[in-house]
Amino acid sequence: MLLTGYKRRFVGSPNDKQDQDHNFACETRLEQYILEGMCREHETIYQILTNFDAEGYDFYYAYQFPKWALEDMQDIPKDIAERFENVSIPAGTYIVFETERCQFPTAKMDELRTKAISQWLPTSGYELRNAPEIGIIHWFWEEGNDQLNNSRYCELWLPIAKK
C-alpha cells in the first residue's frame, strides 16, 4: 500500500497520542485540505505510526491517492510538494480492531490500542512485528444527518507475527 502524507515526531507511547494527535490535526488543516482535494477523498484518513524508539515515533496523516493523482503531484509547486512524502506500507499480517460507531471515534483510539496490546495480544500466540501501525478514520459527514455523522468509526491495524 502506498500512502501520501506528512508527519510529525510524537513523544512517548502510542497509547497516549490523543492530545498530540488533536494538536497536530488542528495545526495542519491546510495540508489536510490540499491532500483531500488532490485525491478527492475526505471520508477516509490514514494515520501511520512508524520509526518507534525509546523517545517516541513518527506520526503521519496520509491519504491513498489514485494513480493519476500521484502523477499530478509532479505538477504542483515545489514549496507545496515538499510538505508531503510517500509512505510505503510493506505486506504482512495485521490484526484489525474497530472502535464503536460514534460522532468522534478518534477519541476512542488510545483505549482501543491499550486493550488490544494488554488483553488480546498476550494470549493470542502473536507478537507485534516491526512494521507501521495503521489507523484508518472513516469520517462520514453530512450536515443535519445525525445518523450518518454518528456512524463514524476507526480501524486500528496492528502488525503481527506468530511467536
Model-predicted segments: where are they?
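A solvent-exposed interaction/effector surface
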Residues: M1-K163
